Amino acid sequence: MPYPVAPMPPRIYITATGIVSAPLDGSGLKPDPLLNGRLSARATVPLMPDEPRLHALARAASEQALAGAPALAGLAADEKGVYVSASKGGMECFDGPPPDLGPGLWRYLSSSPGQAIRARLGWTGPGRNTPLACATGAYSLGLAFEDLRLGRLKAALAGAAEASLTPLIVAAFDNIGALSPARAAGDLRGPFDEQAHGFVMGEAGAALLLESEDGLAMTGHQPLVELLGWACTCDAYHMTSPDPLGTQAARALRLALAQSGVSPQEVAYVNAHGTGTRSGDKAEINVLRGVFGEGAGPRVSSIKGAVGHTLGASGALEAAVTVRALAEGRIPGNRGCVTPLADLADWLALDEEAMAGRVAVSMSMGFGGHNVALVFGKA
């Protein structure tokens, strides 16, 4: 007996976003006395009693995303899932007195932000937490997208948080030469600049509310954009350096476009991973040129020159910014770039500009060679 034919997968929409980060205008880049005067991009977030900072960032972003969605109460608890992750947890354990690791041990796991949100909301549907370094947040969205398309859910809260602005983690990134030595915002060179010399670390929480067509029919929410497709690959090249050719990252982008039914020529904007490291920026340029060609291409920018590199949260944060950019028709500028790398100069949006087109891409590339591409379309 043949297997039953699967129905056409439903379309998936983003109906709300929540962002807790340093200001998107770059004004939050400041010398940090806790980090020996280096620049950092700290977020402002109120803490609840006995709440780890990582949880607070995830909670605040989730509350933003859900603030205008009371109609979700009409969906059954098992029709809603939480896909909020972190690349690491418990960083405060390494910079102070040993915490109580008894019943509170779970709070220091990378999966704990999502667990805390599930418990608070009472959502019992599927949920996954997968730490994949700087691709964590983007991967969380992809997993939620897949489960929604399979009909396992009608709504999902997906995203990530990062709270790693601690002396130990800063020293670790400094030791591998990834951090900018700048101690004043005016000295910082942003992503894709000829003189870029590393990134500034930031922290953030970001959450996106995803709903299937069936979910939308029940909640009545207005979609911001449609999540058309996604893909992930791995370089299998090096633990901290990307493949200089960008072969697998380019494959992820091509696969995501193919799943979305979109040609490269239809992409109006790419929110690049763009960290400001020489090896990372050049590899990503190879990705973009490999997929979009050598002539006219999409507009490109990275927001890390404004908010810092938020590590595991970056994929979710940048996806949320991409969603807002597409919904509002405005491309965020690539802050801190004074002299653009020649191979990308003609595509780079140095300042905010209008977006002409209906499709945008968010790219994430994480340590370990993890690559994720997300493709969004106007709703």
Residues of each region from the PLM?
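Conserved active-site "lid/cap" helical segment
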Residues: 4, 21-86, 90-91, 252-264
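Conserved catalytic cysteine-centered active-site region
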Residues: 8, 31-59, 88-96, 100-143, ...
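Short beta-strand-to-turn element immediately C-terminal to the catalytic PLP-Schiff-base lysine
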Residues: 208-212, 280, 289, 350, ...
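Short, well-ordered amphipathic alpha-helical segments that serve as non-catalytic structural scaffolds
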Residues: 57-69, 111-113, 212-213, 245-260, ...
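Active-site-proximal alpha-helical scaffold in enzymes
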Residues: 59-62, 68, 121, 128-162, ...
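Conserved small-residue
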Residues: 14-16, 34, 62, 82, ...
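Acyl-CoA/ACP chain-elongation machinery
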Residues: 152-176, 183-197, 230-244, 274-281, ...
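Condensing-enzyme catalytic core mediating Claisen C-C bond formation in acyl metabolism
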Residues: 9-42, 184-260, 269
